[in-house]
From Swiss-Prot:
PID domain boundaries: 561-700
Gene that this polypeptide is encoded by: MAPK8IP1
Subunit structure: Forms homo- or heterooligomeric complexes. Binds specific components of the JNK signaling pathway namely, MAPK8/JNK1, MAPK9/JNK2, MAPK10/JNK3, MAP2K7/MKK7, MAP3K11/MLK3 and DLK1. Also binds the proline-rich domain-containing splice variant of apolipoprotein E receptor 2 (ApoER2). Interacts, via the PID domain, with ARHGEF28. Binds the cytoplasmic tails of LRP1 and LRP2 (Megalin). Binds the TPR motif-containing C-terminal of KNS2, then the pre-assembled MAPK8IP1 scaffolding complexes are transported as a cargo of kinesin, to the required subcellular location.
Extent of Low complexity compositional bias: 14-25, 139-149
Annotated disease: Type 2 diabetes mellitus: A multifactorial disorder of glucose homeostasis caused by a lack of sensitivity to insulin. Affected individuals usually have an obese body habitus and manifestations of a metabolic syndrome characterized by diabetes, insulin resistance, hypertension and hypertriglyceridemia. The disease results in long-term complications that affect the eyes, kidneys, nerves, and blood vessels.
Residue span of region Interaction with VRK2: 471-660
Biological source species: Homo sapiens
The protein's name: C-Jun-amino-terminal kinase-interacting protein 1
Chain segments carrying region JNK-binding domain (JBD): 127-285
A GO molecular function held by the record: mitogen-activated protein kinase kinase binding
Biased composition (Polar residues): 162-182, 194-204, 228-244
Function, as annotated: The JNK-interacting protein (JIP) group of scaffold proteins selectively mediates JNK signaling by aggregating specific components of the MAPK cascade to form a functional JNK signaling module. Required for JNK activation in response to excitotoxic stress. Cytoplasmic MAPK8IP1 causes inhibition of JNK-regulated activity by retaining JNK in the cytoplasm and inhibiting JNK phosphorylation of c-Jun. May also participate in ApoER2-specific reelin signaling. Directly, or indirectly, regulates GLUT2 gene expression and beta-cell function.
Entry's localization field: Cytoplasm; Cytoplasm, Perinuclear region; Nucleus; Endoplasmic reticulum membrane
Chain positions covered by the region annotation Interaction with MAP3K7: 283-471
Amino acid sequence: MAERESGGLGGGAASPPAASPFLGLHIASPPNFRLTHDISLEEFEDEDLSEITDECGISLQCKDTLSLRPPRAGLLSAGGGGAGSRLQAEMLQMDLIDATGDTPGAEDDEEDDDEERAARRPGAGPPKAESGQEPASRGQGQSQGQSQGPGSGDTYRPKRPTTLNLFPQVPRSQDTLNNNSLGKKHSWQDRVSRSSSPLKTGEQTPPHEHICLSDELPPQSGPAPTTDRGTSTDSPCRRSTATQMAPPGGPPAAPPGGRGHSHRDRIHYQADVRLEATEEIYLTPVQRPPDAAEPTSAFLPPTESRMSVSSDPDPAAYPSTAGRPHPSISEEEEGFDCLSSPERAEPPGGGWRGSLGEPPPPPRASLSSDTSALSYDSVKYTLVVDEHAQLELVSLRPCFGDYSDESDSATVYDNCASVSSPYESAIGEEYEEAPRPQPPACLSEDSTPDEPDVHFSKKFLNVFMSGRSRSSSAESFGLFSCIINGEEQEQTHRAIFRFVPRHEDELELEVDDPLLVELQAEDYWYEAYNMRTGARGVFPAYYAIEVTKEPEHMAALAKNSDWVDQFRVKFLGSVQVPYHKGNDVLCAAMQKIATTRRLTVHFNPPSSCVLEISVRGVKIGVKADDSQEAKGNKCSHFFQLKNISFCGYHPKNNKYFGFITKHPADHRFACHVFVSEDSTKALAESVGRAFQQFYKQFVEYTCPTEDIYLE
């Protein structure tokens, strides 16, 4: 070891690259090999020098800085190395040592400094190993260091970082939170940056030079940005760049001969040891903007381009984060914008070079640990998923206009405030043109498979059957009837489960399908007619229940009355409401239905139907035209008058009419909305008159009176 050191120190012109002890620091490991805390020395194995570097915490950043400074670049090409350059390097080393003077063992460092300067003088012999003269606090670590030889990398252990108080507990910065620091202590730069001794080298720092003490920040900067700068390291990229950009007279990339083999062994061992000690210094790679003399960053793949905007040493590289105290908060916005603009592609050239307001691509790489990277990405992807769902909601909101789920309590129907109805144009065009043929068993406009994919609210429940799709649960509010073989038949049962047929004679059922049961077998199978599909077949009896019908005496009273009023209107739809009466409930339901129907008014106009008002109830039938009567299968929907709780027209636009019905068995209510070319006041008065007659007949039947004649 003495011969090698004397050759390295006193070589003079024979070995120009070895004139300064700091020349080989930047190639301690290959360019593609990254360590979180690399303190290995290539040209020296001196225990005292290694211990000083351990105490000062010299890591990748400082070694890169010492080897990349332009004022010292002359050492790479000078013959014997100037004494002034060596003095500047020694002063920088002393500053690093003085910066940690308030830590335990600072008085002991002065003795090591004298030995170190004596070892660096040209022609000096190897430094003395004085383990017996070391203080008690350093005895154990020094004795371990002296037992190592040049090839004893297998027994090398870090000595000082575990005993010095170099890592005070300070509040976590936003950057360490973003990088998933699992209880990691801050690096030594935090303590150095907050120290009272500034940089005393007396030289002007180049504008783009990386200074590990302050990172191009003024000394009076606060501790929070200093912490961010201290935890960011771009040394893997810059070290490989500096190695390739070195002048021809610079040091080789790897030592020759068997020295390189032992050096590789030591580096491999250090990788195993130092990765376990990452709880002391936790460094993550950050993409640094290229200097004027450096090529574009092609050493890192695109996925390793950057970890956090707040840890970048050059604020000008990401102008979008200017003025924001916590740039990492905008990572949700980044995922939001990236998803909303899928056509953006990453520009060539390795890392992302974004302009103002343009976010980077979502994939991020973390070289710290697999578990932290997975946890970070899972949270990120969860946020992205949440933002993407919000995107879909926002994209549909312009279609709905002023629709909102909280409109149940709305009392003003703004869309009806205008003089003309939003459906007047569509209604006028439809009456001018030939009437469109409707399916025989379809009065519902609930859904059509050939329509555009429009998402409706789940609260919009249509009353009528649809021959093209399954029916909705609001159909159970009334009774379905159709003409079969010239005779009108009402439904007797309602399907409560979906039944998929497995044989040819079985009948397919959907929930709430109206059924006319014709035969009930002893094996609990029904033979029935599905009024929605017009098919016949058998199905299990427990898949349907019997509908509630009016009592026979009420049906007899209704038959005795031949009073019926008919009105031609257009059915808009039905919606379930929370209350059974009230103008505010009626207006809110009209607003919801009208807003939703406005999406389909052009390609699926409202159904033309006939409202028949009688003492028995309200019947909604298909418009009586030739095209429908030719089908021979006229269908209608019937609501018993006793189940109608409220009706009326809109106070601001009397062309809209609606009535609220109660479910025959459940405590549920639905509002059915219609629109007409003319005023619907007559329709509302007709329903009121039907109520009066129904009440009169009901009272006469339930409370009969006897005439008492007094003599």
